[in-house]
Amino acid sequence: TSDRDLKDNIQVIDNATNRIRKMNGYTYTLKENGMPYAGVIAQEALEAIPESVGSTIKYRDGGSGSEGEEGERYYTVDYSGVTGLLVQVARESDDRITALEEENAELRQRLSAIE
């Protein structure tokens, strides 16, 4: 859910730019159906924003896990967590751009004064 009233311990994602550098965007073909997709790799998301990664168990032959049936555990990604990271990366980038623009304007003024 996105409603602030339903959340506790709200914190801005720190070091978002450094975190996002641990991830890439990919295109890929899903093994189970051969269809093309785009997205991220859960293991990379686990490094960057572990709060966005969960897991699921897939049972053989569509089983339900009853009677001690073993399945394989796979990671899943909640893309709302990745979106939150991307929003914070955009904000950090905007802050850096603004600082560089201000520095550039100051340097131009100093250069004009020298000329």
Task: Outline where the language-model segments fall.
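C-terminal intramolecular chaperone/auto-processing assembly modules
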Residues: S2, N9, E51, S55-E115
